[in-house]
Amino acid sequence: MLRRDLIKSTIATGLATAFPGRAAASGMTAPGPASASDISNDRSFWLEQMHRVAHPVLSALSQRRLRTTMPVEKSREGAGNRGLTTHLEAFARTLAGIAPWLENGGLEHGPATANERELRTGYLEIVRQAIAAGVDPKSPDYLQFGATSQTLVDAGFFSLAVLRAPQQLNAKLDSTVRAQLADALRATRPLQAHANNWLLFAAGIEAALFALGQPWERTRVDYALREHMQWYVGDGAYGDGPHFHWDYYNSFVIQPFLLAILESVGNQEEAWKAMIPAVNARASRYAHILERLIAPDGSYPVIGRSIPYRGGAFQLLADVALRHALPEDIAPEQVRCALSAVLHRTLEPPGTFDKAGWLQIGLAGHQPNLGEGYISTGSLYLCSTAFLPLGLPPEDRFWSAQDASWSAQKLWRGDDMISDHAIDI
């Protein structure tokens, strides 16, 4: 208990020092909506928002109290078994978003980053405790890997986190925990993946097992990659299965998983290696489209399903920025400002969090009717993937350059810009 209290104190102190005047965030009290003049684009704002989203999940699981403390909100038509799987959703999706920060964030020397390093140290401790609690079959918070088909999805997101933090969420884990994690991932193998983006969850699990030094099944990776190459529909977009859907699943799942899987195991087969240039070029193009979809006020088109994933709609844009793979005409600082505006629009409206600090279903506040039957409280934590650029150091241009307008702001105020064009790759 004393160790846990020390970690909690370390995180709270780091927050209060890193962003003075924003210490209320550590108490999980959502502020009112910001005016345009109040919008912050700096790293401390992003850390504040990351903490508001992630800390309730990580803290509860590290104490083996996630099941007893996290609410389970779902739509009226929600599946009855969501209470069994929503906790894995919350943890895996949170971890997938903050993994690059856990791996690399705030590592540079200097007074500007000392508080962030302290914050990160505290987070690493509770994350490792949380992983241990979640993969131990004897734990009251065992995350029920393999219990339902939904656990295939979120074992995939857990795997994505492992791939994004090869040291902190793999090599530096206790050997017992690493073995239990591998067992947990393998427990999802009997589950059938649908012939759509779900194939990438199965493939991501195998890529993570490869990264963990475990036996892995190449056929699951090969099938997922080959099918998605067949499902490419042009101009940077893939179908979700044989058909194209007007939604954000190219960013929620498809392209981030393709990038991570090929980065992990792409060199294991010549056919996979040959896919990398096209997959990277398509990701860059789709990131370009996503940047243009962010309106001058930080809103964006509300189309397709899974809208309560909020800023997760821009996971690929965040991922491409993290990889320094943005198109030449998209400056990193304009992506920072655009994503900051999205964070303000989707995380600051009243009702986004309940009184205890847990996310509620909605896009701009609490809008439970936006939730499809497969969405529950845990699902909402895919919004954490907007925080991927926190894995870049403070000195990186993404963070250090002056604020800049993004494409929609430039165009709607009358700036002259080169017209947009499709790619044929």
What does each model-found stretch correspond to?
Residues A23-A25, A36:
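Boundary at the C-terminal end of the N-terminal hydrophobic targeting segment
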Residues P56-S75, G83, P140, V342-I425:
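CBM-like carbohydrate-recognition segments
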Residues M1-G14:
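N-terminal secretory signal peptides and thylakoid transit peptides that target proteins
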Residues A274, A278-E372, F398-D415:
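Non-catalytic carbohydrate-binding regions of carbohydrate-active enzymes
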Residues A30-E89, P100, E125-A130:
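Low-complexity, Ser/Thr/Pro/Gly-enriched N-terminal "stalk/linker" regions
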Residues A99, R120-N280, R292-A318, H324:
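Aromatic-lined, polymer-binding surfaces characteristic
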Residues N104-V127:
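Beta-propeller domains
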